[in-house]
């Protein structure tokens, strides 16, 4: 049984299954559900199709019965593995680290939650333990939203304490920033430059880009868009640009600018999104917007203090990146708390320290014993 409940082996098994966000995550979800069933979980398969028709699966596992227990929330999707630079889809232990895409973000943390819940005796549980493995976190969190809206297992055993197990080096995180994108497309008229009959979308979008350059400077000091609980307090205002591969001897038919920044939990970011959209529409450009709010729970909230106490008194902090916490917090008070370092996420050579993985598993089990038994 000890070998079967090895978080390193379980993480490696999931790393070996490619589950990049833009494609489906069916295979890794089948693996997770099969493992859960083999270890005494009642499971629920929640599936939808994304805008590209890809199947996206969310697995909810439950041990025990009764509301007011523990919920552990992770995702099975990953960013692309950059296969030209390393072998990302093979879990490899070297020294005191486990390497592979998703080892840190976040198949390792998911494995720790699964092992912790599997290790407890269901007959001794007075409240249920929920373990969820969702899709599309890297693309905006649709899987978490879908799960909170459609999971009957979770609704019937709604936890009082939620752990979003993203990598925080096992430091409790009570607040984080979100993400906003404004996609602006200028349309010209394609033609060979020898005819001089085209209209370059690159020239059309240039005045808007100049406005964004000025706006980027002003938002750094505008108190409406700053959150002083965070380091840095600014929102990381950025812009990327593409004319979709147009060559220099062709007038560009399209040019797309994507403006992005990180909203705080309670700033005025909606106003900034609307201002950018209005400026783009002034020029007649196509505009789409998306904004995911940041997250904040009081640092003295019960779930935050639980993580702090059971991790040896680590003090709660804030982080500038985003997680699925806002989606799950619609139902369950959450703290972000997981093994591994965010500096390893999305990197070539991504790894998780084995000591962190084992420590997380032990802490998660103590949480279950404290809250559910």
Question: Where are the regions a protein language model picked out?
Answer:
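Acidic/His- and Gly-rich active-site-bordering loop/insert found
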Residues: 2-101, 122-125
């Amino acid at each position: 049984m000890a070998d079967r409940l090895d978080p390193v082996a379980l993480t490696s098994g999931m790393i070996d299954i490619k589950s990049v966000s833009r494609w489906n995550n069916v295979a890794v979800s089948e693996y997770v559900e099969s493992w859960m069933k083999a270890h005494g979980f009642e499971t629920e398969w929640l599936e939808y199709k994304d805008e590209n028709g890809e199947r996206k699966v969310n697995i909810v596992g439950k041990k025990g019965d009764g509301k007011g227990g523990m919920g552990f929330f992770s995702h099975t999707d990953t960013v692309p593995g950059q296969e030209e630079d390393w072998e990302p889809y093979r879990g490899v232990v070297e020294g005191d680290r486990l390497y592979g895409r998703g080892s840190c973000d976040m198949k390792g943390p998911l494995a720790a939650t699964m092992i912790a819940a599997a290790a407890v005796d269901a007959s001794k549980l007075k409240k249920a333990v929920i373990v969820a493995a969702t899709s599309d976190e890297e693309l905006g969190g649709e899987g978490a939203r879908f799960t909170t809206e459609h999971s009957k297992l979770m609704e019937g055993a709604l936890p009082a304490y939620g752990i979003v197990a993203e990598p925080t080096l096992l430091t409790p995180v009570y607040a984080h920033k979100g993400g906003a994108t404004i996609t602006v497309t200028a349309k010209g008229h394609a033609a060979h430059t020898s005819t001089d009959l085209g209209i370059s979308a690159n020239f059309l979008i240039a005045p808007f880009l100049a406005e964004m350059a000025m706006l980027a400077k002003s938002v750094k000091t505008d108190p409406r868009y700053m959150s002083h609980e965070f380091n840095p307090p600014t929102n990381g205002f950025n812009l990327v640009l593409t004319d979709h591969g147009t060559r220099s001897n062709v007038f560009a038919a399209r040019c797309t600018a994507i403006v992005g920044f990180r909203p705080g939990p309670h700033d005025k970011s909606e106003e900034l999104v609307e201002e950018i959209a209005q400026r783009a529409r002034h020029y007649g450009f196509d505009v789409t917007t998306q904004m995911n709010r940041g997250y904040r729970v009081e640092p003295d909230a019960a779930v935050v203090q639980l993580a702090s106490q059971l991790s040896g008194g680590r003090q709660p902090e804030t982080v500038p990146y985003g997680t699925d916490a806002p989606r799950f917090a619609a139902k369950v008070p959450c703290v972000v708390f997981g093994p591994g370092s965010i500096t390893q996420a999305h990197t070539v050579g991504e790894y998780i320290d084995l000591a962190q993985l084992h420590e997380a598993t032990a802490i998660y089990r103590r949480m279950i014993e404290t809250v559910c038994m």
